[in-house]
Amino acid sequence: MLRLLVMLASIANCAGGLVLIATWATMWQRVPIIVLFIGASLLIQGAYTILYLRGDLDRWRDLATGALFAGEGLSAVVGAGGLIQSIIHNISNADMEMAPVLAGLLMLVQAVLALLFLLVTDRLRPRVNGRSAV
């Protein structure tokens, strides 16, 4: 069940990233370039997690798991920061912008779900000579 939730969150991240990239590409004169970078971040985060869950990165074993752990940890911090900042911005300004709130929420939720998946499936256990150290 958790695997399915992580997969759905990853697909949502890819879709959200593509929407932000397309928004910047079609209206680049009026949309700040940070929208492109946030969209690329969401797309990369979602795509890497999908590849990991499908087993396409199995040949990299612990390196792929470590990269997923590091990337999702960083995404959780950035997503939480973006979510908090966008909520504070919306509270202090009359114009409510929901896109930054949704982008931060997408990034944070997918990161937390992926980290929980790694923890629950016991993939973060240290290894010595190819075997579990614990």
Task: Give residue spans per PLM region.
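N-terminal signal-anchor transmembrane alpha-helix
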Residues: 1-44
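Alpha-helical transmembrane segments of multi-pass integral membrane proteins
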Residues: 8-16, 70-78, 106-113
